[in-house]
């Protein structure tokens, strides 16, 4: 009955263990970008378990997490770069420097805004979600912009703020998905 879901779950776990942890994590600074797929699978698996199929909505949730992952982890890596360097994990700020990581984080923040408002424009959500998403994304982009323009002394402050807000962002964006379905405005 749940063969597809079991396959998705097993694939996600295998991807995380073998592709991300064994192969990517210590070999490339692209580890977070590619490995982000493993962290983005749970909504697809959960949706499939409840509904029995995979539709556009869980794929949008997948995309939100997938695009959210790089700026979230690069922000952490920017203020923990010494620790990542000591244990030989080639995070983007360690390999290519903070400036490159700041630029990439800002670009991903802009893409995240586009991806996260897309559900409204393709008819999956209503105005509650749209306005909430725009508000949350404006804060995410603000912190990312402040980090992008921070000097050496401010870097850790804004990297930490972006990292912490990104956690709240993901929780709230999904909460507003739910509230939007409840209130359907």
Spans of model-derived segments:
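Hydrophobic residues within alpha-helical transmembrane segments
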Residues: 11, 15, 37, 63, ...
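Interfacial loop-to-transmembrane junctions
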Residues: 141-172
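Helix-coil boundary and interhelical linker segments in multi-pass alpha-helical membrane proteins
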Residues: 3-7, 42-65, 115-129, 177-185
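Intramembrane alpha-helical segments
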Residues: 3-50
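Solvent-exposed interhelical
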Residues: 69-117, 123
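Transmembrane alpha-helical segments that form the membrane-embedded catalytic/substrate-channel core
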Residues: 14-21, 63-81, 113, 136-147
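Helical transmembrane-bundle signal
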Residues: 43, 65-69, 109-112, 116-119, ...
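Transmembrane helix-loop junctions and nearby membrane-interface residues
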Residues: 24, 80, 117-124, 141-151, ...
